[in-house]
Protein backbone atom coordinates (compact mmCIF):
# COMPACT_ATOMS: atom_id res chain seq x y z
CA UNK A 1 0.00 0.00 0.00
CA UNK A 2 1.17 3.55 -0.72
CA UNK A 3 2.64 5.70 2.04
CA UNK A 4 -0.11 7.67 3.77
CA UNK A 5 0.70 11.04 2.19
CA UNK A 6 0.71 9.35 -1.23
CA UNK A 7 -2.63 7.59 -0.75
CA UNK A 8 -5.22 8.86 -3.20
CA UNK A 9 -8.52 9.77 -1.60
CA UNK A 10 -11.90 9.53 -3.34
CA UNK A 11 -14.58 11.80 -1.87
CA UNK A 12 -18.27 11.68 -2.74
CA UNK A 13 -20.62 14.56 -2.01
CA UNK A 14 -17.68 16.78 -2.80
CA UNK A 15 -19.55 20.09 -2.81
CA UNK A 16 -21.04 19.69 0.67
CA UNK A 17 -19.91 21.62 3.73
CA UNK A 18 -18.02 18.68 5.26
CA UNK A 19 -16.30 17.68 2.03
CA UNK A 20 -15.12 21.23 1.42
CA UNK A 21 -13.54 21.39 4.88
CA UNK A 22 -11.96 17.99 4.26
CA UNK A 23 -10.60 19.18 0.90
CA UNK A 24 -9.08 22.23 2.64
CA UNK A 25 -7.28 19.89 5.03
CA UNK A 26 -6.04 17.57 2.28
CA UNK A 27 -4.73 20.56 0.34
CA UNK A 28 -2.85 21.73 3.43
CA UNK A 29 -1.39 18.27 3.97
CA UNK A 30 -0.50 17.76 0.31
CA UNK A 31 -2.60 14.60 0.01
CA UNK A 32 -3.92 13.70 -3.48
CA UNK A 33 -7.67 13.33 -3.91
CA UNK A 34 -10.56 13.32 -6.35
CA UNK A 35 -13.84 14.80 -5.17
CA UNK A 36 -17.16 14.46 -6.99
CA UNK A 37 -20.19 16.64 -6.33
CA UNK A 38 -23.61 15.01 -6.53
CA UNK A 39 -23.99 16.56 -9.98
CA UNK A 40 -20.82 14.79 -11.11
CA UNK A 41 -21.45 11.46 -9.41
CA UNK A 42 -24.75 9.93 -8.35
CA UNK A 43 -23.78 7.42 -5.66
CA UNK A 44 -27.15 5.67 -6.00
CA UNK A 45 -26.50 4.91 -9.67
CA UNK A 46 -24.53 1.72 -10.24
CA UNK A 47 -22.43 3.53 -12.83
CA UNK A 48 -20.80 5.37 -9.93
CA UNK A 49 -19.02 2.13 -9.03
CA UNK A 50 -17.12 2.00 -12.30
CA UNK A 51 -16.39 5.75 -12.24
CA UNK A 52 -14.71 5.49 -8.85
CA UNK A 53 -12.92 2.26 -9.75
CA UNK A 54 -11.42 3.90 -12.84
CA UNK A 55 -9.90 6.49 -10.51
CA UNK A 56 -8.04 3.76 -8.55
CA UNK A 57 -8.27 5.37 -5.11
CA UNK A 58 -6.60 4.00 -1.98
CA UNK A 59 -9.36 5.26 0.31
CA UNK A 60 -13.05 6.12 -0.16
CA UNK A 61 -14.88 8.77 1.90
CA UNK A 62 -18.66 8.76 1.46
CA UNK A 63 -19.94 12.22 2.35
CA UNK A 64 -22.81 12.02 -0.14
CA UNK A 65 -26.17 12.17 1.62
CA UNK A 66 -29.71 13.44 1.48
CA UNK A 67 -29.61 15.75 4.52
CA UNK A 68 -32.87 17.69 4.17
CA UNK A 69 -34.65 16.18 7.15
CA UNK A 70 -38.03 17.80 6.45
CA UNK A 71 -38.05 16.95 2.75
CA UNK A 72 -37.21 13.33 3.58
CA UNK A 73 -40.64 13.01 5.21
CA UNK A 74 -42.28 14.16 1.99
CA UNK A 75 -39.98 12.23 -0.34
CA UNK A 76 -38.79 9.17 1.64
CA UNK A 77 -37.94 7.22 -1.51
CA UNK A 78 -35.54 9.93 -2.62
CA UNK A 79 -33.85 10.00 0.79
CA UNK A 80 -33.58 6.22 0.83
CA UNK A 81 -32.11 6.18 -2.66
CA UNK A 82 -29.17 8.38 -1.63
CA UNK A 83 -28.80 7.30 2.00
CA UNK A 84 -29.27 3.53 1.59
CA UNK A 85 -28.57 2.60 -2.02
CA UNK A 86 -25.62 5.01 -2.14
CA UNK A 87 -23.77 3.37 0.77
CA UNK A 88 -24.53 -0.06 -0.72
CA UNK A 89 -22.76 0.97 -3.92
CA UNK A 90 -19.87 2.57 -2.05
CA UNK A 91 -19.41 -0.60 -0.02
CA UNK A 92 -19.28 -2.53 -3.30
CA UNK A 93 -16.54 -0.22 -4.59
CA UNK A 94 -14.53 -0.63 -1.40
CA UNK A 95 -14.95 -4.39 -1.51
CA UNK A 96 -13.87 -4.73 -5.14
CA UNK A 97 -10.88 -2.41 -4.76
CA UNK A 98 -10.01 -3.74 -1.29
CA UNK A 99 -9.76 -0.24 0.15
CA UNK A 100 -11.05 1.32 3.39
CA UNK A 101 -14.45 3.04 3.41
CA UNK A 102 -15.24 5.92 5.75
CA UNK A 103 -18.97 6.67 5.81
CA UNK A 104 -20.68 9.60 7.53
CA UNK A 105 -23.86 8.87 9.47
CA UNK A 106 -25.98 10.71 12.01
CA UNK A 107 -27.41 10.99 15.52
CA UNK A 108 -30.87 10.61 13.94
CA UNK A 109 -30.47 6.82 14.00
CA UNK A 110 -31.47 7.09 17.68
CA UNK A 111 -34.87 7.99 19.11
CA UNK A 112 -33.58 10.89 21.18
CA UNK A 113 -35.73 9.69 24.07
CA UNK A 114 -32.96 9.30 26.65
CA UNK A 115 -31.12 11.32 29.27
CA UNK A 116 -27.82 9.47 28.89
CA UNK A 117 -25.32 9.82 26.04
CA UNK A 118 -25.96 7.30 23.27
CA UNK A 119 -23.25 4.66 22.94
CA UNK A 120 -22.18 3.17 19.63
CA UNK A 121 -24.02 -0.04 20.54
CA UNK A 122 -27.15 1.63 21.95
CA UNK A 123 -30.45 0.55 20.44
CA UNK A 124 -31.11 2.32 17.15
CA UNK A 125 -34.68 3.56 16.78
CA UNK A 126 -35.01 6.34 14.20
CA UNK A 127 -38.07 8.56 14.54
CA UNK A 128 -37.97 10.06 11.05
CA UNK A 129 -37.69 9.01 7.42
CA UNK A 130 -34.26 10.66 7.31
CA UNK A 131 -33.02 8.73 10.35
CA UNK A 132 -34.37 5.45 8.97
CA UNK A 133 -32.69 6.00 5.60
CA UNK A 134 -29.35 6.68 7.30
CA UNK A 135 -29.68 3.60 9.51
CA UNK A 136 -30.42 1.46 6.46
CA UNK A 137 -27.27 2.88 4.88
CA UNK A 138 -25.22 1.82 7.90
CA UNK A 139 -26.67 -1.69 7.64
CA UNK A 140 -25.78 -1.93 3.95
CA UNK A 141 -22.14 -1.29 4.85
CA UNK A 142 -21.94 -3.68 7.80
CA UNK A 143 -23.68 -6.35 5.71
CA UNK A 144 -21.25 -5.98 2.80
CA UNK A 145 -17.94 -5.42 4.57
CA UNK A 146 -16.24 -7.47 7.27
CA UNK A 147 -13.31 -5.10 7.73
CA UNK A 148 -11.85 -1.78 6.61
CA UNK A 149 -15.02 0.23 7.19
CA UNK A 150 -15.60 3.16 9.52
CA UNK A 151 -19.06 4.54 10.18
CA UNK A 152 -18.74 7.96 11.81
CA UNK A 153 -21.96 9.26 13.34
CA UNK A 154 -21.99 13.01 13.69
CA UNK A 155 -24.49 15.74 14.55
CA UNK A 156 -25.33 19.45 14.29
CA UNK A 157 -22.69 20.11 11.64
CA UNK A 158 -21.71 23.66 10.78
CA UNK A 159 -18.79 25.59 9.34
CA UNK A 160 -17.88 28.28 6.81
CA UNK A 161 -19.37 26.46 3.81
CA UNK A 162 -22.96 25.98 2.69
CA UNK A 163 -26.06 26.75 4.72
CA UNK A 164 -26.13 25.95 8.41
CA UNK A 165 -27.55 27.11 11.73
CA UNK A 166 -24.48 28.99 12.92
CA UNK A 167 -24.20 31.11 9.78
CA UNK A 168 -27.92 31.90 9.92
CA UNK A 169 -27.65 33.02 13.55
CA UNK A 170 -24.56 35.11 12.86
CA UNK A 171 -26.33 36.89 9.99
CA UNK A 172 -29.27 37.70 12.27
CA UNK A 173 -26.89 38.91 14.98
CA UNK A 174 -25.12 41.44 12.78
CA UNK A 175 -27.88 42.59 10.42
CA UNK A 176 -30.66 43.28 12.92
CA UNK A 177 -31.20 44.43 16.49
CA UNK A 178 -34.45 42.50 16.84
CA UNK A 179 -34.74 39.61 19.32
CA UNK A 180 -34.73 36.06 17.97
CA UNK A 181 -36.36 32.92 19.33
CA UNK A 182 -34.23 29.78 19.50
CA UNK A 183 -35.15 26.29 20.70
CA UNK A 184 -33.68 25.35 24.08
CA UNK A 185 -35.26 21.93 24.64
CA UNK A 186 -33.28 19.96 22.07
CA UNK A 187 -29.89 18.91 23.42
CA UNK A 188 -27.03 17.76 21.22
CA UNK A 189 -23.45 18.45 20.19
CA UNK A 190 -22.65 21.32 17.83
CA UNK A 191 -19.85 20.01 15.60
CA UNK A 192 -17.61 21.94 13.25
CA UNK A 193 -16.86 20.55 9.82
CA UNK A 194 -13.20 21.34 10.54
CA UNK A 195 -13.17 19.11 13.63
CA UNK A 196 -14.88 16.27 11.79
CA UNK A 197 -12.53 16.59 8.80
CA UNK A 198 -9.56 16.36 11.16
CA UNK A 199 -11.02 13.27 12.83
CA UNK A 200 -11.59 11.62 9.44
CA UNK A 201 -7.96 12.35 8.59
CA UNK A 202 -6.78 10.78 11.88
CA UNK A 203 -8.93 7.68 11.33
CA UNK A 204 -7.53 7.24 7.84
CA UNK A 205 -3.98 7.67 9.10
CA UNK A 206 -4.18 5.50 12.21
CA UNK A 207 -6.35 2.74 10.72
CA UNK A 208 -8.13 2.00 13.98
CA UNK A 209 -10.26 -1.16 14.19
CA UNK A 210 -13.28 -1.19 11.89
CA UNK A 211 -16.67 -0.31 13.28
CA UNK A 212 -18.99 2.48 14.36
CA UNK A 213 -17.65 5.60 16.05
CA UNK A 214 -19.29 8.76 17.35
CA UNK A 215 -17.62 11.79 15.80
CA UNK A 216 -18.95 14.97 17.38
CA UNK A 217 -17.43 17.81 19.34
CA UNK A 218 -17.65 16.92 23.02
CA UNK A 219 -19.85 18.46 25.70
CA UNK A 220 -23.48 19.24 25.10
CA UNK A 221 -25.66 22.24 24.30
CA UNK A 222 -29.06 23.35 23.12
CA UNK A 223 -29.56 25.36 19.95
CA UNK A 224 -30.16 28.32 22.27
CA UNK A 225 -26.77 27.75 23.95
CA UNK A 226 -25.05 27.74 20.56
CA UNK A 227 -26.85 30.90 19.45
CA UNK A 228 -25.90 32.68 22.68
CA UNK A 229 -22.26 31.71 22.22
CA UNK A 230 -22.28 33.11 18.68
CA UNK A 231 -23.84 36.39 19.82
CA UNK A 232 -21.21 36.67 22.56
CA UNK A 233 -18.32 35.98 20.18
CA UNK A 234 -19.49 38.65 17.76
CA UNK A 235 -20.06 41.17 20.56
CA UNK A 236 -23.84 41.36 20.33
CA UNK A 237 -26.35 41.46 23.19
CA UNK A 238 -27.05 37.88 24.30
CA UNK A 239 -30.35 39.03 25.82
CA UNK A 240 -31.70 39.24 22.27
CA UNK A 241 -31.59 35.43 22.09
CA UNK A 242 -34.85 34.22 23.62
CA UNK A 243 -35.29 30.57 24.65
CA UNK A 244 -38.24 28.80 23.04
CA UNK A 245 -39.74 25.32 22.99
CA UNK A 246 -39.88 22.97 20.03
CA UNK A 247 -43.68 23.27 20.07
CA UNK A 248 -43.33 26.91 19.02
CA UNK A 249 -41.73 25.75 15.76
CA UNK A 250 -44.16 23.22 14.19
CA UNK A 251 -42.44 20.62 12.05
CA UNK A 252 -43.34 17.51 10.10
CA UNK A 253 -40.34 15.80 11.66
CA UNK A 254 -40.00 14.55 15.20
CA UNK A 255 -36.50 15.72 16.08
CA UNK A 256 -34.43 14.05 18.81
CA UNK A 257 -34.82 15.77 22.17
CA UNK A 258 -31.52 14.39 23.43
CA UNK A 259 -28.94 13.23 20.93
CA UNK A 260 -25.65 13.53 22.81
CA UNK A 261 -23.30 10.83 21.52
CA UNK A 262 -20.92 8.96 23.83
CA UNK A 263 -17.27 9.29 22.79
CA UNK A 264 -15.70 6.43 24.76
CA UNK A 265 -15.04 4.27 21.67
CA UNK A 266 -12.14 6.57 20.72
CA UNK A 267 -10.13 6.03 23.90
CA UNK A 268 -10.60 2.28 23.56
CA UNK A 269 -8.66 2.37 20.27
CA UNK A 270 -6.02 4.84 21.45
CA UNK A 271 -7.45 7.99 19.86
CA UNK A 272 -8.52 11.26 21.43
CA UNK A 273 -12.10 12.47 21.26
CA UNK A 274 -12.84 15.58 19.24
CA UNK A 275 -12.46 19.03 20.91
CA UNK A 276 -15.07 20.52 23.23
CA UNK A 277 -17.74 22.34 21.22
CA UNK A 278 -17.06 25.87 22.50
CA UNK A 279 -13.35 25.58 21.79
CA UNK A 280 -14.08 24.20 18.32
CA UNK A 281 -16.49 27.08 17.62
CA UNK A 282 -13.93 29.71 18.65
CA UNK A 283 -11.31 28.10 16.42
CA UNK A 284 -13.45 28.24 13.28
CA UNK A 285 -15.41 31.41 14.07
CA UNK A 286 -13.14 33.81 12.11
CA UNK A 287 -13.65 31.68 8.99
CA UNK A 288 -17.42 31.68 9.50
CA UNK A 289 -17.39 35.47 9.91
CA UNK A 290 -15.48 35.89 6.65
CA UNK A 291 -17.90 33.56 4.85
CA UNK A 292 -20.92 35.46 6.16
CA UNK A 293 -19.39 38.81 5.19
CA UNK A 294 -18.97 37.54 1.63
CA UNK A 295 -22.59 36.39 1.50
CA UNK A 296 -24.18 39.58 2.84
Map each language-model feature to its residues:
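NAD(P)-dependent short-chain dehydrogenase/reductase
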Residues: 139-188, 194-201
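SDR active-site strand-loop-helix element
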Residues: 12, 36, 60-64, 101-106, ...
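N-terminal Rossmann NAD(P)H-binding glycine-rich loop of SDR-like oxidoreductase domains
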Residues: 2, 7-25
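Mid/C-terminal beta-alpha module of Rossmann-like enzyme folds, strongest
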Residues: 199, 206-252, 292-296
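NAD(P)H-binding glycine-rich loop region in Rossmannoid oxidoreductase-like domains
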Residues: 46-82, 95
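Conserved C-terminal active-site "lid" loop/helix of NAD(P)H-dependent oxidoreductases
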Residues: 222-228, 245-284, 288-293
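Catalytic helix-loop patch of NAD(P)-dependent Rossmann-fold dehydrogenases
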Residues: 81-89, 96, 109-152, 156-157
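Adenosine-cofactor binding site in Rossmann-like domains, unifying the SAM/SAH pocket
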Residues: 27, 31-48
